[in-house]
Amino acid sequence: MSHFFADHDAPLSMLSVKTEYFPQLTDKEQKYAHFMSKASHAGSRVVMRQVSHESEPIFDLILAIHSKLNGKYPEDDITQKQQTGLYLEYVSQFLSNLGNFKSFGDTKFIPRCEVKFFKQLLELAKINPCSSPLTLSPVDVNHEFTSHHLFSTINELIDIGIYHVEEKAALLGFPSQGYTSAYYLGLPVTPEDMALLKEQLFAELAILPENTRINKVGENSFQIWVASENVKNQITETYPSGQITLSNAVTKVEFIFGDHSREMRLVASYLKEAQKFAANDTQKAMLQEYINHFVTGSSQAHKEAQKLWVKDISPVIETNIGFIETYREPSGIIGEFESLVAIQNKERTAKFSSLVNNAEEFISLLPWSKDYEKPIFNPPDFTSLEVLTFTGSGIPAGINIPNYDDVRLKIGFKNVSLGNILSAAAKSSSKHPPSFISQEDRPIFEKYQSDSFEVQVGIHELLGHGSGKLLTEFTDGFNFDKENPPLGLDGKPVSTYYKVGETWGSKFGQLAGPFEECRAEVIAMFLLTNKKILDIFGFHDVESQDKVIYAGYLQMARAGLLALEYWNPKTGKWGQPHMQARFSIMKTFMKHSTDKNFLKLEMNSTNDDFAIKLDKSLIKTAGHECVKDYLKHLHVYKCSGDVEQGSKYFIDRSTVTPDLASLRDIVLSKRLPRRQFIQSNSYIDDNNKVTLKEYDETPQGMLQSFLDREL
């Protein structure tokens, strides 16, 4: 039960751009950033509805308590002070994750404070515990599409929505298997349901499912809820009106428009304001497609916006918005709302530009034939950004988008590294020194961890996600020689490929996320030893290069062990794709290297802690060789669409063996709280100038930032 408790003593960081980066912008750029930021935050409730059915009513409750108490919580004695502190820690983590499931780990978390104390706060705030959660919600929300009504009283919301945990229901996954997912409503949705809808509805009608939710109204009857301001279907040329029957002649489906209608209207209205301050015609056209997408629900409009986004090269204010990453929806096809507004860091961007300019040379070093690479590498935009606003359940250190395979193939993609996230994430808290790093390794690890992480993120995003060609059949032919296919891992021509309409996500499903993250991470490990890349990042002498390499391999070994927290021993289920990937890489170091001394663990005398022992003299030989072998398998399986062998291989490599499973309790006992980020709010003052408001790095600062957003 204790592993479900909210983090205690978590570090909080203000994402500050107020003094260094924001003042460098012109008035026009500041206003563009302001309205894009408003559009971004306007989607916050959408994320909560996607995280869990209880997240949005919990949000309304904790903000109502804070407002009615004027931020003054009971602190009359030591017990009250302690309970208040524990309550605020829960609230801060909830707001940081935009829901009551960890964005990194996909498990529910509950307050450490007593239920009795939580209900005392209701009394102090004069909130009737027997009233409906609907009484706390904004009046213009269409509750047909929200979950407030699932809890008859606020007491029930607290008892069941906030505090109740069951081992399986506390994990995200298919409801039919006992897990939780707010992407689905009505009767429990099964993997077979989603496979059917994927193949016979979305693929056949060429409709992208990212901006939908699924309401199962009967055993063979579904409503597809489409996110749009419009509450009626205004795009009947691409989305059928009324109920249709799928090709199995049994299943009935109907598209229902107007999901998140209030939020989609707000997002679109702020985008219209941002249009007035766009830097160029490409940005204006991109914003118009975004507006079309959010108003009508057209998935194709979002794809058009992403094409224009890729063509908007190196903007001073970088933005992206939409239903983007599909990791958290159990079938891997519906996207979480996500939005980024950030300012380019020109000094850091120069490093990444140099990496881009040499990308073809570095890709040619990867261990496969040119048949598995695009014939021409279109150098993508790669910028380092300082985040002003990020709406989503969690903020990554780097992003490589768009995710549409055909756009990536025919037009390209962009890479962004989020500098202020990267710097904060790599910081060790003085209260929490890094676990499992030996005393002798700690000086190198603490000095070079951040530098090594920056290099890894650069390689991961550009050369990891940016490399490879999916062998694909199109309506007008193949993008490879069908009569003489590339050779597979067994030296024989491959027999699998992506048929018309198939994508990486649709073919590999739930495994696509962790598999691709793993491939990108392994490419980072493979190329981290490259002296030219290290030189680009400012490490010119052999000594500093070797320390960056060692810190990088040490960091990956540690991350793979920390990953055990995100693996459920009862279900065998992984809760986080990046951590499943990192575990498999650590396991590769330990169990698939030709020299068993490459990675070992040294237990302490009481068997309640251990230290990582990584032999730095073996990194460039046995270590690099096992990385190369793993990488070649992952890449060929992905590019050839060999879902059977590829899935079997990756599942085997990421399966937790009994000896490693035995370390999980130690990993949990040493678990460090995850850093939380507080974001500023922007305003236009009486002089028509944009001002930024920043907040204290405390739970109260986090709370106030959300209250000021008026969501």
Swiss-Prot record:
InterPro entries: Dipeptidyl-peptase3 (IPR005317), Peptidase_M49 (IPR039461). One of its GO terms (cellular component) is nucleus. It is an enzyme of class 3 (hydrolase). Pfam families: Peptidase_M49. Binds 1 zinc ion per subunit. One of its GO terms (molecular function) is metal ion binding. It catalyses: Release of an N-terminal dipeptide from a peptide comprising four or more residues, with broad specificity. Also acts on dipeptidyl 2-naphthylamides. Its EC number is 3.4.14.4. Belongs to the peptidase M49 family. This is Probable dipeptidyl peptidase 3. It comes from Saccharomyces cerevisiae (strain ATCC 204508 / S288c).
